[in-house]
Each structure stands twice: as structure tokens, then as C-alpha cells.
């Protein structure tokens, strides 16, 4: 368990035939074109107008201009050997006001062009309906994810997407990381629309309506589209693995509780009909309740689980940790070091991201055991580096730490499959350097470097070239790559 995993050897042959390898992005982070194509404002468009909210004062107004460069990007993706692409559809490009009445045909045309070009290049589309870019009008008029009305509006939006794109898109994700929207968007306020730490109950309400909205979208698909289109609809949850800090019972239970407040918060209602008991015990009336009708409605409304995973932590029980409310109420302390003082893994650029490949194997096995071995896709996995303006192009393209990250984590996925977890695919985050939310452009997750100072030109990094060799089965070169 103490091994970093970066010395792991992994080849395409370690995975089953048909296993999907792809890359992932999201609309707000890459598209740009804020005021083009009939698009309405989303909450991030408005949130970033206050430059103090973003580390470098930036926004996604232009981002990396994927809206105008999608053909260049898809051609590069295909040339590297990727055969699947997880992208997100911008809700206000389809319904500028979010109300679900007047479809913006220019928005539909853009995504039709994107999807058709992907398929032409041999790339399978995996479409996310919601990756945090809520139509601003819905936030203003109904309160966004704090209102039960959002469930109906989301279902209308989902139906429009299924109707317009579902003849070609067979893999749908309703919502990306509802935990982040709930906690950072409506609770702490680091993300749009910007809540505040004192309004603790808001994040649990925002989570509640995201679960119901997910179920409503799946219901629409199953009733109106599945028989003809034959696709599948899943939910993407983010989770860091929680490794007990010691063999003490209280630490073992604390680690389980930490997972309840991540995976369990969203998947328990769908698979079992209600929130984890550990959440109910600690939150009381702050945690909304599902009616019996709701419980019946949401049960088993899922075809696959998408897991976004980047890192792991040691978890110890702590009666009153000095942390934000979301962690205080869990009564857990997230620890980065072993008892010996050695860190759990090498740190990437972000202070929260440690390279811990073995954590992913444990997480996949945990999810498989808890939820009856569902179909799982690793829908995001990657690491960031600082944006270093003083570095040469050759230096920034030589991302050997990221190559090691991917080797270790992919080996962990292969091990989980051998353990019996039904993992069907893996998507690297991210294809392109992009707008990294509250961090702006100060962090780079891409396997393709985007030169922000020179026309947003694209340059594949060493990690992209490693992936290309891996996908094309050049195992001998792969094994020599890090020597």
C-alpha cells in the first residue's frame, strides 16, 4: 500500500477487449464564445464578472476557444488514438433562459456538428448534460438547484438533448459531480453561484434536487427514447478514497463515514432509496427527506456509475475538527501523512492532489461491493501542474510526472478489473489545458498544452504521446518510456 504505484507497468493488453479509453472536458472550461450562437449566460459567466472570485481574475469567456476549433481538437484526439470523448453540453446553448420552451437551433447545430465530426473521426461520444453551467436565468428566477422547480426544467432540457442527439449519442451522463455544485456552489461559495459558509443546509437541498433531477432525466429517457435509441444513462460522482489512519475502530468507522458523505450521499438514494444513516444521524433536519413516492421514483434510475477520482487521504475520527462545516459535521480529519511522517503520495500542483494510485483500486472495489457490482466508468482521472510562464515550451511538454500518474492509476484500474469490478472505461482529465474554475488558468490538467500567450496553439505533451503509444499497443516503447 505504501508504494507510489508510479513504477507500475501497464499495457493495453492488461484491459479487456472493448474497454473504452477516452479523454474528457467540459463546455465552460473549453468552449468560450460566451455571446455567440444564441447562447444565454450561465452562472459561471456571471460569477466570474467579479474578478476577485478567480485566482487570476480570469473567466471562460474565451477559454481555449474550442467552439471555433473543435475540428482541430477532434482531429488531434483521433490522431493520438483515442476512440471516446466525454464532453458536456452547455444548457444555456440549448435553452438560453433555461425554461425549456424555445430551443436555440444554433446551439443544437453546434453540438450536431461536433458529434458528427467525432463520429466521422471514429470517436464515440459520451455526453454530460450538466457540468456546472446552469442557465443564469434559472438561478435568478427560481433559485437554481435550491428549488424543486429545477427538476422539471432539467427534465425538459434532457429531453431536448435526447431528441436532438440521441440517435448518435448512446452514453449519457446527467450531472457531473453534484457534490461540488452542492458544497462549493451553494454551501461554501467558492464556485458559482456563490453561497456562504453560514448557510449550511443549502448544500444538502441543492444535492437533493440534483438527485431528483437525475432520476427525472433517466425516467424521460426510459419512457420515451430507450426502446428506439438503445442508450444508457448514468451519474458521475467524485470521490477521494478514504483510507483509515489506524486500526482503531473509530478511525475505521470514520473512513466509512467519509465515503458515505461522498459516494453514499448520491448513490445510496438511487440504489437503496435513502441517504446513508450516518448522514441522517449527523445532519438531522438539515438533510432533506424523500417521500415514499420519491423513493420509489429514484430507485435504480441508473445504468452506470461514473467515478471521478484524483486522490486519496488518510481519515481519522475527530470530535471537532478545525475545518469547514462540511467536514466538521462528518467528524473526520483528512490527513496527508503516514504516522512515520511520510506523505501519502507525491503532491501535484493543487494542494489537495496527492498521487496515490492504490487508492483508485480500493475505491473501485468498494463501489463494486457496496452497490452490487454496477457498470463503472472512471470518468475523470488526472493531475495538474502549475502554469509556469518562465518555462520553455520543451520544458512544459515534458510532463513525466503526469506520465507516471497515468501509468500508476491505469495499473490500479486493471487490478480492480481482475479483482472483479465491472469497470468498462477510463477517461483522462483533461484533453486540453483549460479554465480550472476558481484557479483560473493557473493550473494545467491537460495532456495537450495550450499556449495562452500565442494564439491558444495546441501542443501535445509527453503524456499525450505516451497515451498514443499505449493505445496503439507499442508496449516495448511504453515500458522504456520512464526509464
Curated annotation (Swiss-Prot):
InterPro entries: Glyco_hydro_1 (IPR001360), Glyco_hydro_1_beta-glucosidase (IPR017736), Glyco_hydro_1_N_CS (IPR033132), Glycoside_hydrolase_SF (IPR017853). The keyword Hydrolase applies. GO terms for molecular function: beta-D-fucosidase activity; beta-galactosidase activity; beta-glucosidase activity. It catalyses: Hydrolysis of terminal, non-reducing beta-D-glucosyl residues with release of beta-D-glucose. A beta-D-glucoside binds at residues 29, 131, 176-177, 310, 380, 429, 436-437, 445. Keywords: Glycoprotein, Glycosidase, Hydrolase. Signal peptide: none annotated. It comes from the Eukaryota. Its EC number is 3.2.1.21. Coiled coil: none annotated. It is an enzyme of class 3 (hydrolase). The active site is at 177 (proton donor), 380 (nucleophile). Glycans are attached at residue 398. Disulfide bonds: none annotated. One of its GO terms (biological process) is response to iron ion starvation. PANTHER family: BETA-GLUCOSIDASE 42 (PTHR10353:SF310), GLYCOSYL HYDROLASE (PTHR10353). Belongs to the glycosyl hydrolase 1 family. This is Beta-glucosidase 4.
Amino acid at each position: 500500500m505504501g508504494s507510489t504505484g508510479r513504477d507500475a507497468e501497464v499495457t493495453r493488453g492488461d484491459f479487456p477487449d472493448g474497454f473504452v479509453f477516452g479523454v474528457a472536458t467540459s463546455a465552460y472550461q473549453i468552449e468560450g464564445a460566451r455571446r455567440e450562437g444564441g447562447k444565454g449566460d450561465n452562472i459561471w459567466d456571471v460569477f466570474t464578472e467579479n474578478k476577485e472570485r478567480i485566482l487570476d481574475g480570469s473567466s471562460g469567456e474565451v477559454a481555449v476557444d474550442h467552439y471555433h476549433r473543435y475540428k482541430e481538437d477532434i482531429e488531434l484526439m483521433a490522431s493520438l488514438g483515442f476512440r471516446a470523448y466525454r464532453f458536456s453540453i452547455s444548457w444555456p446553448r440549448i435553452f438560453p433562459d433555461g425554461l425549456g420552451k424555445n430551443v436555440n437551433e444554433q446551439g443544437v447545430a453546434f453540438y450536431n456538428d461536433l458529434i458528427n465530426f467525432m463520429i466521422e473521426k471514429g470517436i464515440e461520444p459520451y455526453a454530460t448534460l450538466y457540468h456546472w453551467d446552469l442557465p443564469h436565468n434559472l438561478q435568478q428566477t427560481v433559485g437554481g438547484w435550491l428549488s424543486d422547480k429545477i427538476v422539471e426544467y432539467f427534465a425538459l432540457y434532457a429531453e431536448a438533448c435526447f431528441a436532438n442527439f440521441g440517435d448518435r449519442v448512446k452514453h449519457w451522463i446527467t450531472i457531473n459531480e453534484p457534490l461540488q455544485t452542492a458544497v462549493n456552489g451553494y454551501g461554501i461559495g467558492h464556485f458559482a453561484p456563490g453561497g456562504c459558509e453560514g448557510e449550511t443546509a443549502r448544500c444538502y437541498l441543492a444535492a437533493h434536487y440534483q438527485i431528483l433531477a437525475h432520476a427525472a432525466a433517466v425516467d424521460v429517457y426510459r419512457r420515451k427514447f430507450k426502446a428506439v435509441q438503445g442508450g444508457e444513462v448514468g451519474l458521475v460522482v467524485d470521490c477521494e478514497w478514504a483510507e483509515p489512519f489506524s486500526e482503531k475502530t473509530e478511525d475505521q468507522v470514520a473512513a466509512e463515514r467519509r465515503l458515505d458523505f461522498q459516494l453514499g450521499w448520491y448513490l445510496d438514494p438511487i440504489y437503496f432509496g435513502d441517504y446513508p444513516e450516518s448522514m441522517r444521524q449527523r445532519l438531522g433536519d438539515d438533510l432533506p427527506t424523500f417521500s415514499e413516492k420519491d423513493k420509489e421514483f429514484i430507485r435504480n434510475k441508473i445504468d452506470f456509475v461514473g467515478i471521478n477520482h484524483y486522490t486519496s487521504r488518510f481519515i481519522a475520527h475527530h470530535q471537532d475538527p478545525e475545518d469547514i462545516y462540511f467536514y466538521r459535521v462528518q467528524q473526520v480529519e483528512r490527513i496527508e501523512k503516514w504516522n512515520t511522517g511520510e506523505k501519502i503520495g507525491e503532491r501535484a500542483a493543487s494542494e489537495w492532489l496527492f498521487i496515490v494510485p492504490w487508492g483508485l483500486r480500493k475505491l473501485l472495489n468498494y463501489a463494486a461491493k457496496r452497490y452490487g457490482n454496477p457498470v463503472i466508468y472512471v470518468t475523470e482521472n488526472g493531475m495538474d501542474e502549475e502554469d509556469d510562464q518562465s518555462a520553455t515550451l520543451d520544458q512544459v511538454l515534458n510532463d513525466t510526472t503526469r506520465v507516471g500518474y497515468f501509468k500508476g492509476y491505469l495499473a490500479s484500474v486493471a487490478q480492480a478489473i481482475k479483482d472483479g469490478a465491472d469497470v468498462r472505461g477510463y477517461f483522462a482529465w483533461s484533453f486540453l489545458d483549460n479554465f480550472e474554475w476558481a484557479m483560473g488558468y493557473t493550473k494545467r490538467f491537460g495532456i495537450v498544452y495550450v499556449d495562452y500567450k500565442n494564439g491558444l496553439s495546441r501542443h501535445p505533451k509527453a503524456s499525450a504521446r505516451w497515451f498514443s503509444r499505449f493505445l496503439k499497443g507499442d508496449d516495448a516503447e511504453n515500458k522504456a518510456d520512464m526509464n
